[in-house]
């Protein structure tokens, strides 16, 4: 058992207030976002971060207790590494799946292998329906999603939304790693909401985490992550629809960058929100 990560018990003190190390940290600087060599607590968990991780664990455990069957839709991004670690080491009752759209980056597939080696577990992969995908490509071409918002949403519907709906069928709640900092639309999220679009509860335990806290947790726990993050990809999706961001851009600016910011969602995050209290 990993020190400090016993079953539901209090996290033991892994932090060391005096231990500092140089790590790559994604921070705001000179009006933009860039990687710098920053003097941070990079290889240990601070007391504050331990407490935040314990709160995530407790919220997830409470969701299981209240709702029964809970599943995590794993995006394989940085936030996903935090949740994967906490779920697999402390709340294993929660199932995990990820959507293989058929157009992911090679680095994303490599990450799946690294996670399997680290935890000796596998993330269940779900795929688009082959018949629906064939019809989509026949209608709009392989890269037709560049032509209009409707075409892009149709692609996301087949490659992401429909597989997602199949994967969550039979569950009472699903977990997401969204954070308020990520975008204006996500800033309105609540820790637990009724997802009327999909007919189950949505649990968002990382809403108030900062990007720096996410990366400090990853470094301290030595969790594998997508190496595209080291190349200015804070948000990673399908390869054709994701680019590196530039200084001063929002961290989701690299997703569907040819569209307006308010359109840069795939349809998995419902826009109509009904907060129902803490899970």
For every predicted segment, state its role.
Residues 2-18, 24-26, 36-279:
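Nucleotide-activated chemistry modules centered on ATP-dependent adenylation/adenylyltransferase
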């Amino acid at each position: 058992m990993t020190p400090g990560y016993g079953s539901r018990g209090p996290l033991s003190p892994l932090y060391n207030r005096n231990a500092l190390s140089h790590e790559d940290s994604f921070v705001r600087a000179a009006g933009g976002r860039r990687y710098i060599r920053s003097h941070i607590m990079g290889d240990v968990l601070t007391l504050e971060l331990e407490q935040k991780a314990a709160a995530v664990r407790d919220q997830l455990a409470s969701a299981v207790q209240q709702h029964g069957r809970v599943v995590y839709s794993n995006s394989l991004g940085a936030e996903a590494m935090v949740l994967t670690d906490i779920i697999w080491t402390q709340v294993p009752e929660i199932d995990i799946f990820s959507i293989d759209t058929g157009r992911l980056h090679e680095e994303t597939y490599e990450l799946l292998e690294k996670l399997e080696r680290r935890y000796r577990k596998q993330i269940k992969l779900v795929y688009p329906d082959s018949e629906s995908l064939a019809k989509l490509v026949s209608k709009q071409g392989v890269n037709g999603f560049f032509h209009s918002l409707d075409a892009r949403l149709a692609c996301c519907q087949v490659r992401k939304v429909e597989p997602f709906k199949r994967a969550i069928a039979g569950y009472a709640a699903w977990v997401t790693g969204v954070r308020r900092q990520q975008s204006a639309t996500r800033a309105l999220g609540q820790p637990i909401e009724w997802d009327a679009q999909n007919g189950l509860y949505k649990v968002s335990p990382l809403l108030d985490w900062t990007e720096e806290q996410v990366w400090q947790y990853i470094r301290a726990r030595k969790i594998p992550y997508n190496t595209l993050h080291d190349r200015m990809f804070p948000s990673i999706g399908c390869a054709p629809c994701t680019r590196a961001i530039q200084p001063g851009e929002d961290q989701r600016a690299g997703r569907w960058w040819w569209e307006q910011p308010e359109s840069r969602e795939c349809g998995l995050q419902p826009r109509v929100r009904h907060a129902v209290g803490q899970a």
